[in-house]
Amino acid sequence: MLSLKKYLTEGLLQFTILLSLIGVRVDVDTYLTSQLPPLREIILGPSSAYTQTQFHNLRNTLDGYGIHPKSIDLDNYFTARRLLSQVRALDRFQVPTTEVNAWLVHRDPEGSVSGSQPNSGLALESSSGLQDVTGPDNGVRESETEQGFGEDLEDLGAVAPPVSGDLTKEDIDLIDILWRQDIDLGAGREVFDYSHRQKEQDVEKELRDGGEQDTWAGEGAEALARNLLVDGETGESFPAQVPSGEDQTALSLEECLRLLEATCPFGENAEFPADISSITEAVPSESEPPALQNNLLSPLLTGTESPFDLEQQWQDLMSIMEMQAMEVNTSASEILYSAPPGDPLSTNYSLAPNTPINQNVSLHQASLGGCSQDFLLFSPEVESLPVASSSTLLPLAPSNSTSLNSTFGSTNLTGLFFPPQLNGTANDTAGPELPDPLGGLLDEAMLDEISLMDLAIEEGFNPVQASQLEEEFDSDSGLSLDSSHSPSSLSSSEGSSSSSSSSSSSSSSASSSASSSFSEEGAVGYSSDSETLDLEEAEGAVGYQPEYSKFCRMSYQDPAQLSCLPYLEHVGHNHTYNMAPSALDSADLPPPSALKKGSKEKQADFLDKQMSRDEHRARAMKIPFTNDKIINLPVEEFNELLSKYQLSEAQLSLIRDIRRRGKNKMAAQNCRKRKLDTILNLERDVEDLQRDKARLLREKVEFLRSLRQMKQKVQSLYQEVFGRLRDENGRPYSPSQYALQYAGDGSVLLIPRTMADQQARRQERKPKDRRK
C-alpha cells in the first residue's frame, strides 16, 4: 500500500507540475464525493480524524446518499440523527438563508467568451473574495464585490488559458488537487507562470508612469497598492474599481463627520482632559467656515485628496468614534495644556486609551436635584479637568448640589450610570496607581449612600423612632412588653432631664440572674427608657452620625467596631471629596505609629460606648462601688455597703435610682421568662396533640384497609358457597331470586331475595328511629 501510494503520488506530482506550467486548473469537487473512494483514500491517507464515526450504521442510505466511510460529513447524513435534528428544530424560528452562487465569467485573450460552467472547475472557492458563497452575510459581501469590480474583470481577459484537448477531465481534476496543495504550501502560480510575471512588470511600469504624472508620490502608490486585489488561486492582480466621490451613493466621509458633529458635538468645552503630548486638532465650531470642518481627521488623512476605498474611510470614522470611549493617563507629574477661552484650537485630543477618564471626579455630586426635562448625565457645561493644576472638579450636573437627600431619595447615580472603573473617587498620591477591580463596588461614596438612606421610606419611620429602635436593640425590656414605635409612646425616666440623654445609643448593663428578693423595691415605676449614651464625642469633625440602615447587613454594625480590628488598622479613608486636587497632599494618611495609637483610643472609646448611661453617671458622681453590686446585692448587704461610705444626697439618690431601674429590669426579665415558658409549654402540648392525631389517622387507615380486605374475603366466600348450592333438580340457584343470610350462631340460610331485601330495610330503619 505504501509503495503504491508513493509511486502514484510521485508520478502525479511530476505530471501536475508539467500541467501547472501550462496554466491548466481543475476542480476538486468531483474527487471529494463518492466517485473515486480509493483515490481519495490514497490522497488523504487513513487518519483517525476521518474514522470517528458510527461504523455499525455506515450503510444507512435510505435517503439516497452514498457517503464514503472516511468522509467527515458522514455523521450529518445519518437518517436517525438528521430526522431527530429536524424534529428538534420544529420549535425554533429559523429564517431561511439565501443561497447565492456566483461564477466568474471569463473569456479568452482572442475575445471569445467561454460559457459559464456551474459544476466545472471555474467555480472559484478560494479566499480571494470571488467565491461561491452561501448565507445572507456572504451574499451581501458578494454583491459588494461584484459592484466594486464591475467591468474591470471583463477587461482583464481570461483567468486561465484554454484547456488542452489532450487531457481528460479526471486528469485535470487530479492536477488541480495537487496544484491547490502547492498553493497551500506557499508556491503560487507566480512561481511557474511567465505571463503572470510579465503582467506584474507591466503593472509596476504603469505605477511608475502614474507616479511621474500625478502628485501622489508615496501616498498614491500605497493607495493604488491597496486597490490592487490578488486572486489566491490564479495569482493575478487586478485593480478594484473604487466609486468616485461624485457618483458614490453611500454616505461619504464628510457626511458622516457632519452627522457625527450634529449628534456628538465636540463643542466649545472639551469632554476629555487635554494632553500636550497628543495630536493637536482644530475642533470646528458652528461659526467657522465649512472648510475647517474636514480637519478633524488631519492626523489620519494625507495632505492631498487621495482616493480612499470605502472600508478605509469607515475605519477612520470608527477610530474617531472610539475616542469617546478611550482612557486617559493622568498622574501627578503631568503638565496639562489649557488655552484661553474663545481659541478654536484650545481642544486637544489624546489618541492613547490607557486609564479611565474621570480620574478625580467627585462622584458625591452625581445625585441630581430633580428629574426634569433637562436631566442630563453629562451637561453641556462640562469642563476639562487638569490633574496637577488647581482647578474646579468636573461638574456632572447643572445643579452642583452635594445634598444626598434630594428628589432621588439619595440614590447613588454613580452605580447606575457609570462602569466600575469610572465609579471611583481616586485620591492622587505619590505612589504608583494600581488597578482596583473592586474600587467601584466598595466605593466609599456608595457605602455612605447606603448608610445615609432614611428610614422614613420604610414603614413611616422617622429619626426619633430610629433612635428608639436602637435603644430597644440592647434593652432587655423594650421588645416584649408591647412597646410602641410611635413618637407618643416614648417614655422618660428620672434621669431624662440630663443633657446627655438627647442623642443616644443603648447598651445593656444588667445581669440576667435574680439572686435577691424584691421586698424593698418592686416592679413599680418601670420605664422602657433604656440606658443610653451620648454620641456627641463620637461626632467630632464628621458632623452627622447616620442611622445604620436596615438594607445593608454591614451597616448594622457600628463603624467604630470595625476600626478597632487589627487587620483594619492600616485602612484610612480620605473624605476630602470637595477639595481641589492640589490640596489633597495636605490630607494624606498619618504614619503607622499614629494609626496604632488612634486604634487604641478608638478601642477605649468603643468600650466607653458599651457602658450604660447609669454607669457614666456613677463614674461622674464618683460612686465607690459598681452598678452590679448596687443592683444584685440583697437588702441587708446593700444597706451595709451604704453605711460603709460617706455619700452625699445626690450620690444616694443616684444609687437608689440605679437600683430601682435594675430591679425593674430584672422583674421584666422574669416576667418575660415566665411568659416564654408558658408559650413553650403550650407549643409542646400542641406538638403532642399533633403527634397523637397523626397516630390515630394512621390507625384509622390501617383499620379501613383491614376492613376492606375482610369484606373482599367474605364476598369471595359468599360467591363460592352460593355457586355450590343446588336445588332438588341439581340446578344452581339464581342470584337474582335467592340470597344467603348469616345467622347469629354462625349458620348460613338460603332465603328468597324479597325477604332478604325486607330484612335489610328493617335494619336500616332501626338507626334512624334511634336518632329521632
From Swiss-Prot:
Question: Which PROSITE patterns does the annotation name?
Answer: BZIP (PS50217), BZIP_BASIC (PS00036)
Question: Which GO terms of the molecular function aspect are on file?
Answer: cholesterol binding; DNA-binding transcription activator activity, RNA polymerase II-specific; DNA-binding transcription factor activity; DNA-binding transcription factor activity, RNA polymerase II-specific; identical protein binding; promoter-specific chromatin binding; protein domain specific binding; protein-containing complex binding
Q: Which GO terms describe its cellular component?
A: chromatin; cytosol; endoplasmic reticulum membrane; nucleoplasm; nucleus; protein-containing complex
Q: Does the keyword Ubl conjugation apply?
A: yes
Glycan-bearing residues: N348, N360, N412, N423
Q: Where are the transmembrane segments?
A: 7-24
Renumbered to this chain, region (Leucine-zipper) spans 682-696
Domain (bZIP): give its ranges. Answer: 654-717
Name positions with the PTM Phosphoserine. Answer: S528, S599
Site entry (Cleavage), positions:
W103, L104
User: Which portions of the chain have biased composition (kind: Polar residues)?
Assistant: 113-131
| Region of interest (Disordered), residue spans | 108-148, 470-532, 582-613
Q: What is the effect of changing W103A?
A: In m3; impaired protein cleavage
Q: Where is this region: Cholesterol recognition/amino acid consensus (CRAC) region?
A: 191-199
Q: Where is this region: Basic motif?
A: 656-675
Q: Where is the composition biased (Basic and acidic residues)?
A: 598-613
User: What SMART domains does the entry give?
Assistant: BRLZ
Q: Which Gene3D superfamilies does the record associate with it? A: Transcription factor, Skn-1-like, DNA-binding domain
Residue ranges for the region (CPD) are 379-383
Matching InterPro entries = bZIP, bZIP_Maf, NFE2-like, TF_DNA-bd_sf
Per UniProt, subunit arrangement is: Interacts with KEAP1.
Identify the PANTHER family for this entry.
ENDOPLASMIC RETICULUM MEMBRANE SENSOR NFE2L1, NUCLEAR FACTOR ERYTHROID 2-RELATED FACTOR
Q: What is known of its domains?
A: The cholesterol recognition/amino acid consensus (CRAC) region directly binds cholesterol, as well as campesterol and 27-hydroxycholesterol. Has much lower affinity for epicholesterol.
State the similarity comment: Belongs to the bZIP family. CNC subfamily.
Q: What is this protein called?
A: Endoplasmic reticulum membrane sensor NFE2L1
Please state the gene responsible for encoding this protein: NFE2L1
